[in-house]
């Protein structure tokens, strides 16, 4: 005869499972009316699987659907978190509001604080120091331009050769190699910028980390602190970081000895030394600090340069005017930072490309650290992840024929007193949020601008480029990201009778 406990056990299991489902429904669809509509919310989509998949493959269409509703704010379920999407009109109000956290919005999504994913028992300084280190680097860019120029030409000659016959090259592979070599030169100096082992790590770390994060995020959040120890992408990432440590830590020791033995005023800027001194003896992960900075720098600059080159392949009529501008500005004076600032047509082409093809279709991410009532009465609940819609980049009152690519658009703005402030590439505005806006705007945009210009200068002066016949480079969208097709190719040849531009 069955005992009462034995009889009740199956029913208790059913009841328990039911309670879990009910709790999940309450958490996903809390009681009370939500003043914001959710664009991709679906009935019975308990774990938002359908909504996330829809965003993964139709993010731009969903964003446009939200904008067409007439609401100034709406929710959008993404493959990472659910965002409250705000129109760009709010950017000026929120940009410096301390009630909205920038790092608090990004760090949990990127899992930078997940113990053991990258480092343990070494504190979190490596997550905090990159903005300060990049700002320190910005002050040295005027001195670094000749060195960055030298690395750009070295890399192009190595990859594209001096052949005067047309031959095919990969756009993404070329740009990634250029950015890796140039950024390493800026951050770590001449010792590592041509080190093949380090460059391989630098080029692949960002992608490998993205794969690892995606693998972890596919599991429930309460399992993530444990499951990453067993996931192959995470284990591969930790192995790669250890290889990086075998390079960075000896380099740091050499920098410490050199800094102590030399007069500081005679030493070049070293990002390794800057962070080491910033730590003031505190324990920190020197390797992760460098990888953090490199990951951000690569993402910003490589995306921009790839898309500009692709645009030039589609608009060859811009190549000769750009080349003439470079020749007239550089002349015999070499590529200095002061001469780079005079390349206004080049800046215009870069900014117009970025306006139409930003790396992410939404931007300026924030987390509401408390309940906030905006000036128009819109209430943003505490704990809400917000992002901006990037809608003003298509505002016809701001941009004539905004859907059309116009390489001269921002150059003409320099002649209009009402719009001159919008023209510089590194200037942030609520109508152009590619670098964010306000006190949390991307500090690496100045290095990105200089590197992009130097690369384009050397290409224009020394090579002819064109699209591969029948296969123009195209973009691919996945979730909120818009990137050049990884297989994008173009044809290049060394220009006859040309010489490398002087570096300074």
Curated annotation (Swiss-Prot):
Record localization: Membrane
GO biological process: verruculogen biosynthetic process
Residues annotated as binding heme: 442
Coiled coil, from the record: none
Residue ranges of the TM segments: 12-32
Reactions catalysed, as given in the entry: fumitremorgin C + 2 reduced [NADPH--hemoprotein reductase] + 2 O2 = 12alpha,13alpha-dihydroxyfumitremorgin C + 2 oxidized [NADPH--hemoprotein reductase] + 2 H2O + 2 H(+)
Pathway it works in: Mycotoxin biosynthesis
Cofactor: heme
Membrane topology qualifier: Single-pass membrane protein
Keyword Transmembrane: yes
One Gene Ontology term of the molecular function aspect: iron ion binding
The keyword Nucleotidyltransferase is assigned to this record: no
GO cellular component, one term: membrane
UniProt xrefs under SUPFAM superfamilies: Cytochrome P450
Predominant place of localization: membrane
Alphabetical keyword list: Alkaloid metabolism, Heme, Iron, Membrane, Metal-binding, Monooxygenase, Oxidoreductase, Transmembrane, Transmembrane helix, Virulence
Highest taxon in the source lineage: Eukaryota
Broadest EC class assigned to this enzyme: oxidoreductase
PANTHER family per the UniProt record, alphabetical: CYTOCHROME P450, P450, PUTATIVE (EUROFUNG)-RELATED
Function in brief: Cytochrome P450 monooxygenase; part of the gene cluster that mediates the biosynthesis of fumitremorgins, indole alkaloids that carry not only intriguing chemical structures, but also interesting biological and pharmacological activities. The biosynthesis of fumitremorgin-type alkaloids begins by condensation of the two amino acids L-tryptophan and L-proline to brevianamide F, catalyzed by the non-ribosomal peptide synthetase ftmA. Brevianamide F is then prenylated by the prenyltransferase ftmPT1/ftmB in the presence of dimethylallyl diphosphate, resulting in the formation of tryprostatin B.
Family: Belongs to the cytochrome P450 family.
UniProt name for this protein: Fumitremorgin C monooxygenase
Organism: Aspergillus fumigatus (Neosartorya fumigata)
UniProt gene name: ftmP450-3
């Amino acid at each position: 005869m069955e005992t009462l406990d034995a009889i009740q056990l199956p029913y208790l299991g059913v009841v328990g499972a039911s309670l879990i489902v009910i709790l999940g429904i309450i958490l996903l669809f809390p009681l009370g009316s939500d003043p914001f509509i959710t664009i991709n919310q679906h009935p019975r989509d308990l774990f938002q699987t359908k909504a996330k998949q829809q965003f993964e493959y139709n993010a731009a269409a969903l964003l446009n659907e939200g904008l067409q509703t007439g609401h100034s704010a709406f929710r959008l379920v993404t493959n990472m978190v659910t965002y409250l999407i705000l129109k760009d009109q709010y950017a000026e109000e929120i940009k410096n509001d301390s009630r909205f956290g920038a790092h608090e919005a990004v760090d949990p999504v990127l899992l930078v604080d997940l113990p053991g994913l990258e480092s343990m028992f070494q504190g979190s300084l490596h997550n905090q120091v990159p903005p300060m280190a990049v700002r320190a680097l910005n002050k040295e860019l005027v001195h670094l331009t000749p060195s960055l120029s030298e690395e750009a030409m070295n890399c192009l000659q190595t990859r594209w050769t001096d052949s005067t016959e047309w031959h095919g090259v990969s756009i993404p592979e070329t740009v990634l190699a250029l950015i890796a070599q140039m950024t390493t030169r800026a951050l770590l100096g001449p010792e590592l910028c041509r080190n093949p082992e380090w460059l391989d790590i630098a080029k692949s770390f960002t992608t490998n980390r993205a794969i690892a994060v995606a693998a972890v995020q596919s599991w429930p959040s309460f399992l993530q602190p444990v499951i990453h120890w067993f996931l192959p992408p995470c284990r591969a990432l930790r192995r790669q970081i250890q290889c990086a440590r075998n390079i960075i830590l000896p380099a740091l020791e050499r920098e410490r000895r050199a800094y102590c033995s030399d007069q500081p005023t005679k030493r070049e800027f070293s990002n390794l030394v800057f962070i080491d001194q910033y730590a003031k003896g505190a324990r920190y992960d020197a390797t992760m600090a460098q990888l953090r900075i490199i990951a951000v720098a690569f993402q910003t600059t490589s995306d921009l340069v790839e898309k500009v080159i692709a645009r030039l392949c589609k608009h060859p009529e811009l190549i000769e005017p750009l080349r003439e501008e470079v020749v007239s500005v550089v002349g015999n004076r070499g590529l200095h930072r002061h001469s780079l600032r005079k390349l206004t047509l080049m800046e215009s082409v870069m900014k117009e490309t970025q306006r139409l093809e930003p790396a992410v279709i939404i931007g300026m991410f924030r987390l509401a650290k408390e309940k906030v009532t905006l000036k128009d009465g819109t209430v943003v609940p505490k704990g809400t992840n917000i992002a901006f819609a990037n809608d003003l980049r298509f505002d016809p009152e701001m941009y004539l024929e905004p859907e059309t690519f116009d390489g001269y658009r921002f150059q003409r703005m320099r002649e209009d007193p009402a719009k001159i402030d919008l023209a510089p590439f590194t200037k942030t505005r609520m109508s152009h949020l590619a670098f964010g806006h306000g006190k949390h705007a991307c500090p690496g945009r100045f290095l990105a601008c200089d590197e992009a210009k130097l690369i384009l200068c050397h290409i224009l002066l020394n090579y002819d480029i064109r699209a591969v016949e029948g296969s123009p480079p195209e973009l691919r969208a996945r979730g909120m990201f818009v990137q050049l097709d990884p297989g994008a190719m173009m044809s290049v040849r060394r220009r006859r009778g040309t010489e490398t531009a002087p570096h300074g």
